[in-house]
A protein has these predicted regions:
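Short loop/turn motifs at secondary-structure junctions
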Residues: 39, 73-75, 117, 181-186, ...
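Processing junctions and N-termini across compartments
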Residues: 30, 34-37, 243, 288-291
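Conserved alpha-helical substructure of the radical SAM core
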Residues: 2-105, 109-113, 317-328, 355-365
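Flexible mid-to-C-terminal extensions adjoining Fe-S/redox cofactors in radical SAM and related proteins
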Residues: 261-370
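Short cysteine clusters
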Residues: 36-43, 249, 294-300
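Canonical radical SAM enzyme core domain
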Residues: 50-64, 82-118, 123-131, 138-143, ...
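Secreted/processed peptides and extracellular or luminal domains of membrane proteins
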Residues: 42, 46-49, 255, 300-303
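Radical SAM enzyme [4Fe-4S]-AdoMet core and its adjacent flexible, acidic
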Residues: 119-120, 124-126, 130-276, 309-310
Length: 370
């Protein structure tokens, strides 16, 4: 079947139209600062020493950077760190000119004034209060509790829940608290960069986590911004005949010589994308690594891009196209690239469709023959 035939479905046509009207997204990521107010166990930023040799840019460099990116055609920025909430003034400047999504640990509230629009806020959580305190708060700081307080009912906010493989039983109670707080949830998956092992070891797989995610989708279909398809691709590292790794990753700095050979291998990538260090003058290999082994990367942001840039692989059936289209739609909705208030009403229907069982063709053939 062709794309035109799939779009005869009114719901798919609506989703597709919303994405087309948003226009082409030209994105980058940037470290707003090289400093942070906590140290999470296994944080990719400090584990790969991304703070070393790239001090936070001066105001003059920051202003020049924004102007340069506007001229280059950038219209969407993923803001990471260090900890971006430490620089609220710079967040306001970014939101004046770009749509943006910021990742925060939640300890310091990002103010509302001057940041009412053009900004989505992903709040990190890694498990229940005890696990989060141990993994992110140094065993002392109740970051999850503070973040719940800071972002209660905040329309800009969603939870960016990094699931640790051996702690799948915590997913449902944590999501209950997030939803009760008035915030939707997107999932990420933990890479054991500190070699903690045992329950934290990503090599044990995320099958139990996926099952728990599917259960919270059933319970809160309007509040979970990850589909079963996205969850499977990210946590297994499989996309059709491709296995996740540097050779297929689509989000890397195209101006950095370390990636020039990768750009020649025929696999799709985003030609505009760059991952800027905190000095805003240099780029690194990709969003989440300098020398990191990509086998430990379960970053949902980069896997979103992997799926999105592989449309052709998803044209074999209406179900496959639906997997692709709903992935794109989720990314656009989370980041307010489409109208958020009307778009979020489609989330429950997206989950309903993706939870439908695909008919077993062999069984149907046997029935027809009898």
């Amino acid at each position: 079947m062709a794309l035109k035939e799939y779009l005869q479905d009114p719901f798919l046509k609506e989703l597709y139209g919303s994405i087309r009207r948003a226009g082409k997204i030209q994105s980058i990521s940037m470290d707003l600062t090289h400093t942070c107010n906590i140290r999470c166990t296994g944080c990719y930023y400090f584990n790969d020493h991304m703070d070393v040799g790239h001090p936070t840019a001066s105001e003059a460099v920051f202003d020049a950077f924004l102007q340069k990116e506007r001229e280059r055609g950038t219209n969407f920025i993923t803001i990471v760190g260090g900890e971006p909430s430490l620089k609220p003034g710079r967040l306001r400047e970014i939101a004046r000119y770009f749509k943006a999504s910021v990742s925060t640990n939640g300890l310091k509230k990002i103010p509302m004034k001057g940041l009412e629009k053009n900004l989505s806020i992903g709040i990190s959580v890694w498990g229940d209060a005890q696990t989060d305190r141990r993994m992110r708060g140094g065993g002392k700081i109740d970051i999850f509790e503070k973040a719940l307080e800071n972002y209660h009912g905040d329309p800009r906010a969603f939870w960016y829940y990094t699931v640790i493989p051996g702690y799948a039983s915590q997913i449902e109670p944590v999501v209950e608290r997030c939803v009760a707080n008035g915030n939707p949830v997107l999932f990420n998956f933990y890479g054991d960069l500190k070699s903690i092992g045992n329950r934290a070891d990503h090599r044990r797989g995320f099958a139990e986590a996926r099952q728990a995610i599917n259960r919270v989708v059933d319970r809160f279909p309007h509040m979970i911004y990850m589909t079963s398809y996205i969850s499977e691709v990210v946590s297994t590292g499989r996309l059709y005949d491709q296995k996740w790794g540097y050779e297929v990753c689509t989000s890397f700095s195209t101006d950095n010589p370390v990636n020039f050979e990768r750009m020649q291998n025929g696999m799709p990538y985003s030609p505009h994308f760059r991952a800027y260090n905190a000095d805003l003058q240099t780029t690194r290999r990709c969003c989440t690594g300098i020398d990191r082994d990509c086998a430990s990367c379960f970053d949902v942001w980069q896997h979103f891009s992997w799926i999105i840039l592989n449309l052709r692989k998803h044209l074999g059936s209406k179900r496959e196209f639906t997997n692709w289209l709903t992935t794109v739609y989720m990314f656009y909705l989370i980041n307010r690239l489409i109208d958020y208030d009307s778009g979020k009403k489609n989330i429950a229907e997206i989950h309903r469709r993706l939870c439908e069982k695909t008919p077993n063709i062999a069984v149907l053939d046997n029935v027809a023959a009898s």
